[in-house]
Regions:
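Soluble "head" domains of membrane/secretory-pathway proteins
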Residues: 2-17, 36-37, 41-42, 47-282
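Hydrophobic membrane-insertion alpha-helices, especially the h-region
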Residues: 18-36
Length: 282
C-alpha cells in the first residue's frame, strides 16, 4: 500500500522534521527582530530611579545608533570593533549597554559625549567646566511594594509612613538640565557618598560617559569595574539600544501559578511612559 502523500508524487513533509524547521525559523525571526529593531528589557534595580523602577518592563529600540556586536540579543556575537550606520546618542538619552568586561546588560543615562570633560564636586555635575543647571524639586512620594525598594537598594533610608500609615518612599529630587537642553529628575541623597567627587575626566573618542539617575546609588562610569561599575567612559560599540517606553510595570505580588494575580500586580499609570527626556528649546 502506498504511503499517504506519495500517491500524487509528493514527499511527506510532516512530522518532527517540519516542526523543528518551523521552530528554528521562528527563533531566527525573533532573534532578528530583537537584534535589529526592538526588544523588551526588565529593570532589576533602583539605579535609574526616579524615572525607572524595579519591576518596569521597557521597549528598547536597536536602530537609533546603528548596530554593533552589542546589538545582537543574548550576547551571541563576538566582541568586534566597529558599528554599522553609527550615530552618537544625545546627552540625556537612556541607553542599554553591555558591560565592557562582564557583558552583563546595564541601563544608564548618557551624560558625556566624546571630547566632553566630566567632573563632580560635592555631588554637583559640571560638563566642560560649566556647572549643570540644578533645580531642587518637591519631595517625591512613591508607594512601597515588594519590588520597591529593590534588593540591596540604597533607598531604604527614605521609607516612611503616609497619613494612612502606608509605607512610602519620600525621595529628594533635583532636576538637572544638560547642555543641549535635556532635562530630567535625579535623586540626591546628600553629601558624603564616594561618587560625589569625581574627575575631571575627558571622554575619549568613540566613548560615552554614563550615569544613573539615582546618583548616589548607581554603579556607573564613576565606579571602578571591580565594584560592578563601568570603570570610566564606555566604548560606543558597547551600546545596544535606546530605551523608548515603559510597556508595563509590576509590583512583585504576582504568582506565576495564579494568572488572576497577574492583573492585580500591574502598577497603575506606568504603561506608556515615554522615556525620551524633555529637551528645552525644542
Amino acid at each position: 500500500m502506498a504511503k499517504r502523500g506519495a500517491r500524487n508524487g509528493t514527499k511527506d513533509d510532516g512530522g518532527w522534521g517540519k516542526l523543528i524547521r518551523d521552530v528554528v525559523v521562528i527563533l531566527l525571526l525573533v532573534l532578528g527582530i530583537h537584534s535589529c529593531v526592538a526588544k523588551p528589557f526588565y529593570i532589576p534595580s533602583d539605579s535609574m530611579m526616579p524615572v525607572l523602577r524595579n519591576g518596569d518592563r521597557l521597549i528598547v529600540s536597536k536602530y537609533p545608533y546603528g548596530w554593533s556586536y552589542s546589538s545582537v540579543s543574548f550576547h551571541l556575537a563576538p566582541k568586534v570593533d566597529g558599528r554599522i550606520f553609527g550615530t552618537l546618542p544625545e546627552r540625556g538619552d537612556i541607553v542599554v549597554l553591555e558591560h565592557p568586561l562582564t557583558r552583563i546588560d546595564y541601563i544608564k543615562r548618557v551624560i558625556g559625549l566624546p571630547g566632553d570633560t566630566i567632573a563632580l564636586r560635592n555631588g554637583e555635575l559640571s560638563i566642560n567646566g560649566k556647572p549643570v543647571k540644578r533645580e531642587v524639586q518637591p519631595m517625591l512620594s512613591i508607594p512601597v511594594d515588594p519590588n520597591l525598594p529593590g534588593p540591596d537598594s540604597s533607598l531604604f533610608r527614605f521609607v516612611s509612613r503616609d497619613a494612612r500609615g502606608e509605607p512610602v518612599l519620600e525621595l529628594p529630587i533635583v532636576r538637572e538640565t544638560l547642555p543641549g537642553g535635556a532635562t530630567f529628575d535625579t535623586i540626591d541623597m546628600g553629601p558624603g557618598y564616594p561618587t560625589d567627587d569625581y574627575g575631571p575626566v575627558t571622554v575619549p573618542a568613540n566613548h560615552l560617559f554614563l550615569m544613573g539617575d539615582n546618583r548616589d546609588g548607581s554603579a556607573d562610569s564613576r565606579v571602578d569595574a571591580s565594584q560592578k561599575g563601568l570603570g570610566g567612559p564606555v566604548p560606543f560599540d558597547a551600546i545596544a539600544g535606546r530605551a523608548e517606553i515603559i510597556s508595563f510595570s509590576t509590583d512583585g505580588t504576582a504568582e506565576w501559578y495564579n494568572p488572576l494575580s497577574w492583573l492585580g500586580a500591574l502598577r497603575p499609570n506606568r504603561a506608556g511612559t515615554d522615556l525620551r527626556p524633555e529637551r528645552q528649546g525644542k
